[in-house]
């Protein structure tokens, strides 16, 4: 993680994956892996979290899949929150202020549109803990 952050700080575009319950919690995961908060704040351009869920059919069965995407740009407020080692709630508020599209909002729109059901969301989204 530290090598990737150093590369990002020198102008390289870095795409990476890591396991975290949400895009905001991925930022905390970086610091858990030894990246200094001020470096993470400077290196990040944004974080995307995705979940692949099954499409609900009208008969209650499933066919096909689609992606729930959470997109968190690293705006000024989020970077400031990262630098001060803010917790999940403050990071989430900062991300939302910077225009993030967060998973709970994506889930609400998806359920309202009838694209899948709550059972499938709970199955895929870690038992509903991330929303």
Across the structure, where does each feature detected by a protein language model lie?
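Short, flexible helix-loop junctions that flank or precede catalytic/ligand sites
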Residues: 1-131
